[in-house]
């Protein structure tokens, strides 16, 4: 059945197909059709895990980028995900980069996007979260506005942290998108030190204010040298971050050279990212030694490569591109077999 749906969606521009999917899941998720949707997907509960002090019904999650504004939470939940991460969201609404900005590479089962954090702003997302009928684990992925300088970026993260804290089960600091100018600079040296110091201090204040501790994860890029991975791991440990998500999209085209759309600027996700992200997970695991949980993301499209990421050191997994190419049945397979 999904083969027919995919054929129809792939006849549309990639972003048009995404928008149509979100609208459909929003409508079905918030209507009397929701129980029917759950029956249609028929996903088992899976194997529960406790990570970051949170109880996940299974280790398979929806990656950020699928539901930027939290509009289709119930629809995605019906697929059987153990957790859902919405965003990336910024303090103020922004249009992102000019269209077209999403490109499929069907031969490689890859996607290139240069969206640039297009979203309706943190306030809009929070309203959607407040009204969502969802009792699973919800992550909110936050970033900075494009017009905010890298030097002033910390202020944007703190604004979003303040507003998301009460409504999120965990929060992700996105400093690794390749589509916001200069953003990846925040992964290194003093910039990362300053950002995490500010975030942890605000987390402490908010925990006292709301009388609950909300874990904070950091999402990193796959395009890191050995030395950079070591440095990031050390910084995450010193600041006692609650988790790390590895990885975001890649700017490398080594695995898709010569394919149509491979020359497009932006971050590459899907199968071409599979090996690179797993290598980063394995290297991170060596450095972190289990002190900080790793959430694996990047090119998951089968039970076999999902297990590779678990073996490399990931404790939870996230996917999005694999869902586009393989449909909701992939979620069912992963939930059934990944422990």
Curated annotation (Swiss-Prot):
Binding positions (FMN): 64-68, 88, 141, 174, 219, 247, 270, 299, 320-321
Matches recorded under SUPFAM superfamilies: FMN-linked oxidoreductases (SSF51395)
Gene Ontology terms: biological process: 'de novo' pyrimidine nucleobase biosynthetic process; 'de novo' UMP biosynthetic process
Annotated pathway: Pyrimidine metabolism; UMP biosynthesis via de novo pathway; orotate from (S)-dihydroorotate (quinone route): step 1/1
Binding residues annotated for substrate, in chain numbering: 68, 113-117, 174, 179, 248-249
Reactions performed catalytically: (S)-dihydroorotate + a quinone = orotate + a quinol
Entry keyword set: Cell membrane, Flavoprotein, FMN, Membrane, Oxidoreductase, Pyrimidine biosynthesis
Principal localisation: membrane
GO CC annotation: cytoplasm; plasma membrane
PROSITE patterns the UniProt entry points to: DHODEHASE_1, DHODEHASE_2
Localization (cell): Cell membrane
GO molecular function, one term: dihydroorotate dehydrogenase (quinone) activity
Active site (catalytic residues): 177 (nucleophile)
HAMAP family assigned: DHO_dh_type2
Binding partners and assembly: Monomer.
Function: Catalyzes the conversion of dihydroorotate to orotate with quinone as electron acceptor.
Name recorded for this polypeptide: Dihydroorotate dehydrogenase (quinone)
Organism: Pasteurella multocida (strain Pm70)
